[in-house]
Amino acid sequence: PEEFALFRDKIFPIVMQWEGGGKLHNVAGDSGGWTIWGIAFNYWKSLFKDFNDFKDTTMEEASYIAFVKFYLAIRADAMPYETKLYYFDMAYNMGTSRAIKIMQQCAGVKDDGVIGMITLSKMKNIKEECLKSKRESFYNRLSESKTTLKKFLKGWLNRSKSIYDFKY
């Protein structure tokens, strides 16, 4: 309950500033398709009865989904307090597997995308600066290899910096 309260009251609202809030939107070129509260219908259809159910998602419902499917899935609860926001935002923006692999690179363990006992034991030593550096390098490489995504690069980098600079 304490970890969820931190997430719901502090972390999730900050990230929502970069996700269009509760406005239903569909950005051309974004593979997620229709999105509300940062939840992409194309990726999370199974959580909803239909599109109407999806488009009526409240912020509270979205925070539960994000907490379980992202925050807990990446074990943000095991991260140092000052890195929880940045690490969660990485996962919410680039996917859980990519975020975990970047975190593992910063931890100096095999970046296989699986959080086992070795990774878990190293997570308390993760530095936010390392996450930021590797995240931004990933965005730059991605926009170079997939030119259709280049239009998102400036926004991704602005988001990374803003979340990094934010202190709660």
For each feature predicted by the language model, list its residue ranges.
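Cell-wall polysaccharide-cleaving catalytic domain and substrate-binding groove, primarily
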Residues: 1-168
